[in-house]
Regions:
Chain B
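Membrane-proximal alpha-helical signals and transmembrane carboxylates
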Residues: 2-10, 16-382
Length: 525, 382
């Protein structure tokens, strides 16, 4: 039975299905082309590769001829290879050979691989995919006319910057080296600190298109094998087209995905990675990212600076207490200001109340409006300051200060006490050592303000309880986010708010270092 | 915790939401911040005057510049008035008289006129107790006559409020003295009337035609009986002994007669303390014995040897103390808290004699001994 379909819904469905079918057919054809074996015909190989890559501008075929007349070509990616090395190490030896067109076959490629390959090594390539994969890794692929297959010779050049100070985790005393975008360099920085065969490094490749190298580091005998397996399994499950930074992996592998609080530690410091490994954690280094991942991580870890371990333990303890005060202040102060000035004026000393009331006498906005306006304004200035070039940054600071600090008060848009409050928390929040926690606290401040505006201190209490419950519910690879505070673990208080001296820190953290508990032998303590 | 328990806790947490919320918030510039309150009673009505800070007179940071004078065109305070048959009605009337929300919590000074005191403290403080936002740290002062006249000042353009002026007097001139004289509201609320205690309120007076703000007056201090009504004014010469006995002040000057009729000299008491001993025999309070101890020095002419001056000074202190006790007994006002002392020492005895103390106190035998050591002061060396 035949007929003409007229129903628009059915037609639309058919159109979508046919479009999907075409896409699938194209994908299959593309894959077939990729896995196609390299033929003996040089021109044909060149045509296939150029067709597949749409004649990519950064790919170059250079033809050559041996002294004996054999034709060949070298395929490489511009700026991925050391050009001088390629010419001197591959092109010149090949053109000097007496091979003729009649001498075709596999042995020629093997000879190339064995005799003229530079130090970087060589490997045989059988199909188009193999050829393309190798050129993105710095290989020069040699084709010989009449010989099926090719040989890839590593003459790679790595574009990388030199090792510099970490941007977000600087210390006055202590090591100043920071990670860069090159994964191997980052591995070497960790290896310099852990010169032990127990440092195990697993290499994986993540990202269908980016094919990013990911290194999983663990300390054999110290890190729990189950933790390593878990992280490895989560990494293996990733099926994404590209990984451009370690944060891609963080969002894909971390335990609690719907939270603003960082549940893994991202650090630019190789010493923090080494310290994490010594505590029984794992680290992930992603090629192309200057930030390594340390997991599992807890909130107290985020409140810890690397400098804590490079200075007197009492000073470090004091600074940690100051940081916790700054954390609490930056989280609660704007909300408390709104609650006190709107609901609980009796809690304000009378002289201050009069001054504040006088300062607010001409302000049209309610206190919550003032606070939100100024908070958003400060966030805009801060965000803009993070983007603009250094030269314009000072102008921005002056502009922001003048506009917010002077003009807004004089114009009666905001009152002066609120500037003190917001400026205070802007400074206080910077005392938190972890930039991701800083962002989370900035975000969490807004619900506290709204809670204070709606229900006063009671509202703040509500939001704070909610926040505490949320934090207590988080975990990082099986470790409670608030540990050792919740669940309470007194043995780990040695490195919580108080940092005990090293001679008292004889054991690893119980939450991660249970495989090899003792950190120091009896003599050192 | 069971699910039912969780539900109960959840309900308890949620319930207070209905007690407060964004519907009852006030921005600070909507507040009429009360600094002082004067309460009078006449013609069957309570009259209340609230002195409110004029925030317009406070220089805002936006106006501050080297040329600005800080709101000198404005008076530092404005007055809100209200009247009603009860104090609550009068306070509500004050609230209604302002377009702003009257904010009682900052009240620092509470002036009570004679008329209001004659009505008794019970209705006054009962009302304040029902105003939860009323701060109980306010100083309570008595005003002979009208409290309103003491509070209202016609010195417009003053940079401080009348209440601030009163507090400054308290702070700089009478701080130590007023500890025992001008109790805070919470002291008054905790006042132990049950055990027969009377209270002394420092008085404040504004001279009728003076431009000056009201001043403290010791000689007009009002004694409030256990029933909360005024019993009379404590004479100024009795004030010192009252302070010694209650342990609120340990210094003072007394005039001592020189032996052999050689005139008088002045003794400066540097440290005096008193200890009251309640004599109980066979289940009855037989009397009170007061023992004065301490030191003093001759501040006037050294008109006799120290031994003689010692005796004269101690005699004078005994007579001063007895005079004060006599005044208190005559006015049936246990300002020394002896009833309270009996209750604390022997509660079972107190419980066995309901109403006994009220009738016994006016006739209670009291003895005084003084052992104050007088030394030669700088003046006496001349």
């Amino acid at each position: 039975m035949t007929g003409i379909v007229t129903d628009p819904d059915v037609l639309r469905d058919l159109r979508i299905r046919s479009a999907n079918l075409i896409d699938e057919i194209e994908e299959v054809l593309f894959r077939n082309q990729l896995s196609r074996p390299l033929s003996a015909n040089l021109t044909n190989n060149m045509a296939v590769i150029q067709g597949l890559t749409h004649q990519a501008a950064d790919l170059q075929f250079t033809k050559f001829a041996c002294r004996g007349g054999l034709q060949g070509a070298i395929l490489f990616a511009i700026d991925f290879v050391n050009y001088e090395l390629m010419v001197a190490g591959i092109v010149e030896p090949l053109t000097g050979l007496n091979w003729t067109q009649a001498e075709v076959g596999r042995p020629l490629l093997e000879q190339v691989a064995k005799t003229i390959a530079p130090v970087g090594g060589a490997e045989a390539v059988d199909n188009v995919k193999g050829a393309l994969d190798s050129i993105w890794s710095g290989g020069a692929v040699v084709f010989l006319d009449g010989t099926s297959g090719a040989v890839s010779i590593n003459v790679g050049k790595i574009n990388k910057r030199s090792i510099t100070r970490p941007v977000s985790e600087q210390v006055v005393m202590g090591p100043h080296a920071g990670f860069i975008e090159d994964g191997m360099t980052n591995l070497s920085l960790v290896r310099q600190r852990l010169k032990t065969p127990r440092l195990w490094i697993d290499r994986m490749q993540v990202g269908r298109h980016t094919r990013t190298a990911v290194y999983l580091l663990s300390l054999y005998g110290v890190t729990d094998g189950a933790l390593v397996d878990e992280v490895k399994s989560r990494l293996c499950q990733i099926n994404i087209d590209g990984v451009l930074d370690s944060n891609y992996l963080v969002e894909l592998v971390k335990s609690d995905r719907w939270t603003i609080f960082p549940t893994v530690l991202r650090t630019e410091r190789p010493d923090r990675v080494a310290a994490g490994l010594l505590e029984g954690r794992v680290a992930i280094i992603v090629d192309g990212s200057p930030l390594a991942i340390v997991a599992p991580a807890t909130l107290p870890m985020m409140m810890t600076s690397a400098a804590d371990y490079y200075q007197n333990w009492m000073v470090a303890t004091f600074l940690r207490i100051v940081r916790y005060i700054a954390l609490t202040a930056s989280l609660l102060t704007p909300g408390l200001y709104v609650a006190l000035t709107t609901y609980h004026q009796e809690a304000i000393p009378t002289p201050l109340l009069i001054t504040m009331a006088a300062a607010r006498s001409d302000v049209p906005l309610p206190a919550v409006g003032e606070v939100l306006l100024l908070m958003v304004l400060f966030d805009i200035i801060r965000e803009a300051g993070a983007r603009v070039p250094t030269g314009i940054g000072s102008a921005l600071t002056i502009g922001g200060t003048l506009v917010v600090g002077q003009a807004a008060v004089r114009a009666g848009i905001i009152s002066s006490p609120i500037i003190i409050v917001v400026a205070g928390i802007v400074i206080a929040v910077l005392a938190i050592p972890n930039p991701e926690l800083v962002q989370a606290v900035r975000f969490a401040t807004y619900p506290v303000i709204l809670g204070g505006a709606i229900l006063g201190v009671y509202g703040i209490l509500f939001v704070t309880i909610g926040l505490a419950l949320h934090l207590a519910s988080l975990e990082s690879f099986g470790v409670a986010y608030l540990s050792p505070a919740a669940p309470i673990r007194p043995t780990d208080f040695k490195d919580f708010i108080i940092r005990l001296p090293w001679f008292r820190q004889t054991t690893r953290p119980a939450q991660t270092g249970y495989t090899d508990v003792m950190r120091q032998g009896p003599r050192s303590s | 915790m069971t699910a039912r328990g969780l539900e109960r806790w959840g309900a308890l947490l949620l319930l207070p939401i209905f007690l407060t919320g964004c519907w009852d918030n006030f921005q600070m510039n909507q507040l009429a911040i009360v600094d002082a309150l004067a309460v009078d009673y006449n013609r069957g009505q309570y009259h209340v005057v609230a002195e409110v800070f004029n925030t317009m007179a406070v220089p805002a940071p936006a106006q501050s510049s080297p040329t600005a004078t800080g709101g000198s065109n404005h008076s530092s305070s404005v007055f809100l008035e209200g009247a009603g048959k009860t104090l609550g009605e009068a306070l509500a009337d004050v609230s209604a008289s302002s377009s702003r929300h009257v904010f009682w919590a900052s009240t620092q000074v509470l002036l009570l006129g004679t008329g209001a005191l004659q009505q008794g403290l019970g209705p006054l403080f009962g009302t304040f107790l029902h105003y939860p936002q009323f701060r109980s740290t306010a100083r309570v002062l008595a005003v002979p006559g009208s409290a309103q006249s003491a509070l209202e000042s016609d010195t417009s353009g003053m940079e401080i409020t009348v209440a601030q002026e009163i507090r400054n007097q308290d702070r700089y001139l009478h701080h130590d003295l007023s500890q025992g004289w001008a109790p805070r509201l919470y002291d008054v609320m905790r006042w132990d009337t049950e055990h027969g205690r009377s209270m002394v309120l420092l008085s404040l007076e504004k001279k009728p035609e003076s431009k000056m703000n009201p001043q403290f007056r010791m000689d007009q201090s009002l004694v409030i009986g256990p029933d909360g009504r005024a019993r009379g004014s404590l004479p100024s010469h009795d004030a010192m002994a009252y302070l010694w006995i209650t342990g609120r002040f340990s210094q003072g000057y007394v005039a001592a007669g020189c032996p052999a009729g050689a005139g008088q000299t002045t003794i400066y008491l540097t440290s005096v303390s008193a200890r009251s001993h309640v004599v109980v025999q066979r289940g009855t309070v037989r009397g009170i014995h007061i023992r004065l101890t301490g030191t003093g020095k001759v501040a006037g002419p050294l008109c006799a040897n120290l031994s003689g001056l010692n005796m004269a000074a101690n005699r004078r202190m005994v007579s001063l103390t007895m005079q004060t006790v006599d005044w208190a007994e005559a006015h049936d006002a246990d300002i020394f808290g002896w009833g309270q002392q009996i209750y604390r020492q022997t509660p079972e005895l107190w419980n066995d004699m309901p109403g006994y103390w009220r009738s016994r106190f006016p006739h209670m035998p009291v003895s005084v001994t003084s052992h104050v050591t007088i030394v030669q002061g700088d003046e006496g060396r001349v």
